[in-house]
């Protein structure tokens, strides 16, 4: 299955093949977690989109777009915004992705990389016809809990799927 990413002019994006390694798996006794083949396969399935700058975000519990406080590292611009309100943190992905006819793009949080205080939302992008870019969204799971995203940390995991095959 073919996947093409067209970068929107004036933007940068850092995409890499998803690696097998996970910090929490490395920390298990004798790296025991790597003995689970389904975890290893899932970890490395697809590509990851990485943060281009470190930042701290916190949801105050309100429903407005002003209820998320975002603090980028000095001299940088945070790659996420409060766009929808209701505790949803939004990353704009500056690419137009294209897949072959009948293939869509599964978009979700990084596989087997839990993050305290926030959860990734998932979606299917109809990249075989849609002429639009998309956003990756996370929802805070509790208010007043600072969440940090580091430069180079994955915030989105993508892989092509054939949804028609499920019917």
Give residue ranges: language-model regions:
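Non-catalytic terminal segments and appended small domains
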Residues: 1-133, 139-167
């Amino acid at each position: 299955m073919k996947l093409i990413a067209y970068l929107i002019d004036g933007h940068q994006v850092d995409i890499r093949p998803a690696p097998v390694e996970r910090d929490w798996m490395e920390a298990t006794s004798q790296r025991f977690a790597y003995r689970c083949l389904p975890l290893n396969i899932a970890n490395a399935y697809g590509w990851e989109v990485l943060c281009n700058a470190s930042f701290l975000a916190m949801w105050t519990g309100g429903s407005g777009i002003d209820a998320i406080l975002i603090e980028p590292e000095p001299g940088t611009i945070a790659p996420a915004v409060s766009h929808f309100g209701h505790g949803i943190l939004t990353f704009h992905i500056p690419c137009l992705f294209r897949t072959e006819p009948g293939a869509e793009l599964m978009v979700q949080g990084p596989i087997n990389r839990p993050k305290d205080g926030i959860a990734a939302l998932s979606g299917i992008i109809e990249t075989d016809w849609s002429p639009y870019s998309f956003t990756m969204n996370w929802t805070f799971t509790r208010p007043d809990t600072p969440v940090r995203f580091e430069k180079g940390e994955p915030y989105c995991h993508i892989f092509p799927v054939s949804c028609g095959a499920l019917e």
